[in-house]
Amino acid sequence: MTVQEINKQIYRMELKWKIKPFEALTVNELYDLLQLRSEIFVVEQNCVYLDLDGKDKKALHLIGEYEGKIVAYSRLFDAGISFDNASIGRVVVDANYRDKKFGHDLMREAVAQIQSNFGKDKITIGAQLYLKKFYESHGFVQTSEMYLEDDIPHIEMIRE
């Protein structure tokens, strides 16, 4: 291991996690998480489809903050809302923080929160195809052919 790799581990940034139902989100939290989702899912991905799909009120919202700023976020659902199994969606990390491995932290925390809040181990996601290896590194396995969602290639993946 190089000195640089050791220093990265020593000075690893830690996120502060919050898990909240929709009703418990503050106005500022809601604004900030919707802004982050829009920056990534609409602007960065050039996707002119509505991000607000009516499911936010049914989700637990997992928020990762660094120095008071929301930099990681996902929605968590019990079984029967998005898929037959519990599910994770709208997985997003602020573009300015992607080199910090916050996406991996977010997925580990999301899986733990689903197990804690819903008592479920089987989790389904609708993953953007280009992130297949990322999700495989968290135990997810592809279970469908590629399909288009909002003109973006996706696959269904399950973690058991």
Model-derived segments and spans:
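Short amphipathic alpha-helix that is part of the acyltransferase structural core
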Residues: 2-51, 56-61, 66-69
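A short beta-turn/loop motif at secondary-structure boundaries
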Residues: 52-57, 80, 148-150
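Conserved beta-strand in the GNAT
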Residues: 63, 69-78, 85-87, 92
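A conserved beta-turn-beta hairpin within the catalytic core of GNAT-like acetyltransferases
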Residues: 79-88, 98, 117-121, 151-153
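Conserved acetyl-CoA-binding loop-helix of GNAT-fold acetyltransferases
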Residues: 93, 99-112
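Conserved GNAT acetyl-CoA-binding A-motif
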Residues: 107, 114-127
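Conserved catalytic-core motifs of GNAT/GCN5-like acyltransferases
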Residues: 124-126, 136, 141-156
